[in-house]
Amino acid sequence: MMLEPSIDKLLDQVDSKYSLVVLEAKRAHELRDKERPTKEFKAVKRTLQALEEIADGTVKIHPAPELKRETLVEKRELERLQAKMKEQLIKEQIAKEEAEEEAKQKNSRAAKAAAAE
């Protein structure tokens, strides 16, 4: 039984078996943590999915791990700020709707008071 992707095809994408194992493990963890896949998979297991991506060349070892780490930190910070801004917009919309509702109620009470006189 031939395993797909083959070890030869995989080793064409990385420098060594060690690098392959490390890349596979890291990518499998990313996929488990809901990182966006780069393709449709034949395999069900995350480790085999990672190997499929490596064989296709869509996942590579980052040349500067520190830079990748910084990029991830920046990405997470940006996502956090975007979520905070979205939350703030929702709060502002709620406050605006509450103010409009309060104004309608005031106008309604004023109209009733004027009609009663």
Curated annotation (Swiss-Prot):
GO molecular function (one): DNA binding
UniProt biased composition (Basic and acidic residues): 96-105
GO terms for cellular component: DNA-directed RNA polymerase complex
Protein name in the entry: DNA-directed RNA polymerase subunit omega
Catalytic reaction annotation: RNA(n) + a ribonucleoside 5'-triphosphate = RNA(n+1) + diphosphate
Region (Disordered): 96-117
The entry's keywords: DNA-directed RNA polymerase, Nucleotidyltransferase, Transcription, Transferase
First-level EC class: transferase
Function: Promotes RNA polymerase assembly. Latches the N- and C-terminal regions of the beta' subunit thereby facilitating its interaction with the beta and alpha subunits.
UniProt keyword Phosphoprotein present: no
Compositional bias ranges of the Low complexity kind: 108-117
EC nos: 2.7.7.6
InterPro entries on file: DNA-dir_RNA_pol_omega (IPR003716), Pol_omega/Rpo6/RPB6 (IPR006110), RPB6/omega-like_sf (IPR036161)
Pfam families, A to Z: RNA_pol_Rpb6
Any GO BP annotation: DNA-templated transcription
Family in the record: Belongs to the RNA polymerase subunit omega family.
Organism: Lactococcus lactis subsp. cremoris (strain MG1363)
Subunit structure: The RNAP catalytic core consists of 2 alpha, 1 beta, 1 beta' and 1 omega subunit. When a sigma factor is associated with the core the holoenzyme is formed, which can initiate transcription.
NCBIfam families, per database record: rpoZ
